[in-house]
């Protein structure tokens, strides 16, 4: 891998803020997804981790631990209709909550009030917005060797993936402190040494089994960072960063277009949204609230 040019080095500071690591592009670049296994057929281990390479992929290679090099952390609001099996509204991908989360219906946050407004509402009023979800999206490079149900092995080395964090994988409640926290931020992002970016380090990811109030089991990702070994910025990583930027810019350009159409009173293009979401796998499991 070659070293970066001076121009590319100078671009990194701006990219750090744009990618949430401290846009015009094509939405047709679809990243494989890192997922948690909830299927125990054929002797599969619940809670194991695998990569779904595309929407038609069924030959998965499972492991208990992966090494992940984070590149981007973004947030997105959405409304998912289980009956229609599609996303009916979604916001721009935002790197923090100071950004305006314009959405495809011409509102902000798919109509969800601000956190402050939600806290001040009575419980019955908050429930009206329960279908509006906030998803944390991590993009980066994963490395691991896994086995499929036939016992065959496959090695992924610095393989670009998307991780969707919903429900308890996005936010949890610290009952002792009576505070909400984000596991990825608490276990990794807030510990990144000053002056570094999230992509300067690897983090080992495992899963932990938990139970909700209804005694239903689910799994959360657990993060163990490796801050002893700072990773260099090289050409291959820079190219991946630019690809991710293109994905984010393309998504946001699309949402912005729908936002301004809605403001002008033009018909919301639900079919176009459905077509776009067909490029991703079905989101019924991704948007299920496991809390």
Placement of each model-derived feature along the sequence:
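Charge-rich, solvent-exposed alpha-helical interaction surfaces
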Residues: 15-18, 180-183, 187, 275
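Extended serine/threonine-enriched, polar tracts that run as long, contiguous segments within proteins
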Residues: 137-230
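OB-fold ssDNA-binding interfaces and closely related basic DNA-contact patches used
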Residues: 2-160, 216-218, 278, 282-291
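Long, highly charged low-complexity segments enriched in Glu/Asp and Lys/Arg with interspersed Ser/Thr
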Residues: 90, 95-101, 110-111, 216-291
